[in-house]
């Protein structure tokens, strides 16, 4: 490895090690909310804009993941249909509401909202929408970043039942380079994926203890076809992306 790649690994490992202790309590609370939703046959929706939408895809139809998750996906708030346009769209008040209406979020459900900055209109309105429907809200955000840029704006962390602070710095990138004032090496995606997969592993263990853990198998594993078909049939009614 080079010096800069070593620094990236060192930074990321240090942040993950810190999260392991600091997030123990909120991660446990998040797992309890998600487990309760699963046991009541409710759903866990996952919403993010820009690169944060990858958290929704990560938890959807995932080998080793739970079938209770529903990604909230729309090209306008993702990257493939126009990255610059999506950055503009997520700041337009009211624009995300028709997207949310498609999913039928209701009382007893959980909405995970992922937003590193935690101040743009789309994640704020998603959290408010879920609360109005009686769903619990879990936020994955950078408290440092959000506090640095809020400037009186509503912050996602103020609307959540559980706040999972990913410890990403303002601006996300962590590595300084000689000869440049710019930084490289964003960390929010790696941190967010780790936090959420750890929580869902905890949930899965709890559901196994209750006798019903709807866990997907990798499509290349023996017996996966039957297992996954049964899960898709069971959960398709409230997941338009299966």
Curated annotation (Swiss-Prot):
UniProt name for this protein: UPF0309 protein Oant_1457
Gene source species: Brucella anthropi (strain ATCC 49188 / DSM 6882 / CCUG 24695 / JCM 21032 / LMG 3331 / NBRC 15819 / NCTC 12168 / Alc 37)
Protein's GO biological process: carbohydrate derivative metabolic process
One example GO MF annotation: carbohydrate derivative binding
SIS domain mapped to chain residues: 30-214
Family in the record: Belongs to the UPF0309 family.
Pfam family, one: SIS_2
Covalent S-S links between cysteines: none
Spans traversing the lipid bilayer: none
């Amino acid at each position: 490895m080079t010096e800069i790649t070593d620094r990236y690994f060192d930074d990321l490992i240090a942040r993950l090690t810190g999260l392991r202790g600091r997030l123990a309590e909120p991660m446990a609370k998040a797992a309890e909310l998600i487990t309760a939703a699963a046991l009541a046959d409710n759903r866990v929706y996952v919403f993010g804009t820009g690169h944060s939408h990858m958290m929704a895809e990560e938890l959807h139809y995932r080998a080793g993941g739970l079938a209770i998750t529903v990604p909230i996906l729309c090209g306008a708030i993702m990257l493939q249909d126009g990255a610059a346009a999506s950055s503009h769209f997520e700041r337009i008040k009211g624009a995300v509401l028709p997207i949310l209406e498609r999913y039928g979020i209701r009382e007893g459900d959980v909405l995970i909202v992922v937003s590193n900055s935690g101040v743009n209109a789309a994640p704020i309105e998603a959290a408010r929408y879920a609360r109005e429907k009686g769903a619990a809200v879990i936020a994955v955000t950078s408290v440092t970043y959000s506090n640095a840029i809020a400037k009186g704006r509503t912050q996602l962390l103020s609307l959540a039942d559980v706040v999972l602070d990913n410890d990403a710095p303002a601006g996300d990138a962590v590595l300084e380079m000689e000869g440049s004032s710019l930084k490289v090496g964003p960390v929010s995606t790696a941190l967010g994926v780790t936090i959420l997969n750890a929580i869902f592993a905890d949930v899965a263990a709890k559901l196994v203890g209750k006798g019903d853990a709807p866990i997907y198998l990798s499509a290349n594993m023996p017996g996966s076809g039957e297992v996954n078909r049964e899960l898709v049939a069971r959960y398709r009614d409230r997941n338009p992306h299966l």
